[in-house]
Amino acid sequence: MESERILGQNHILRHFENAIRMGKISHAYIINGEEGSGKMNLAIHFAKALQCERNNSNKAINEDGERITVPGTACGQCKSCKQTDSKNQPDIKYITYEKSGIGVDEIREQINDDIDIKPYSSPYKIYIVPESEKMTVQAQNALLKTIEEPPEYAIIILLT
């Protein structure tokens, strides 16, 4: 099972898995913790499970046309899971920045200008923002409007 790689976060893993199973996904999450505590691994794990073809509720139908329960965890075998492992999943975006902080231009170019484009191959378009505490005030304000009125398919994960 994929979640065995993440240690000491069972309560968070269960929360994410239950949210996927029940179809109650929020449009934004904050994952907070010390440097080196595995925040990025947890965010990728969640994004991978969200995009996993096995968890896609549209495909969660058996041969008889009956809905089946989605597992809430990533299978690790489907095309989307393999793309996520190689960091090539087109609907999971990792926000990057070159300066000492995340400026308004990075937020506008990498999130705000991109978020209205529907997902390419998955049910969600997921943005992972590492070190989000390094956003300038202007970047925070630019992101705030997007978080307040996101498209239904968008999920933003802030790591601090």
What is each residue range found by the language model?
Residues D116, N141-L158:
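Conserved catalytic/switch belt of AAA+ P-loop NTPases
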Residues M1-E131, V137-Q138, I155:
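P-loop/Walker A NTP-binding region and its immediately flanking N-terminal helices
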Residues K134-M135, E149:
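Residues immediately C-terminal
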